[in-house]
Amino acid sequence: MNIEELKKQAETEIADFIAQKIAELNKNTGKEVSEIRFTAREKMTGLESYDVKIKIM
């Protein structure tokens, strides 16, 4: 696979995972997710990960 294919595959997998977690939250809480905020966590070598905050209505 080339870089673009790998990037597209990763984006699709991440989007599917987020959609699955939103559905689980909706089902388990009976409330809707109103916002998801991603904050980059960086090191000197570059992006390490993200902190995620979810708001539920």
Swiss-Prot record:
InterPro entries: Gns. Overexpression increases levels of unsaturated fatty acids and suppresses both the temperature-sensitive fabA6 mutation and cold-sensitive secG null mutation. It comes from Escherichia coli (strain K12). GO terms for molecular function: identical protein binding; protein homodimerization activity. Signal peptide: none annotated. Disulfide bonds: none annotated. It comes from the Bacteria. Belongs to the gns family. This is Protein GnsA.
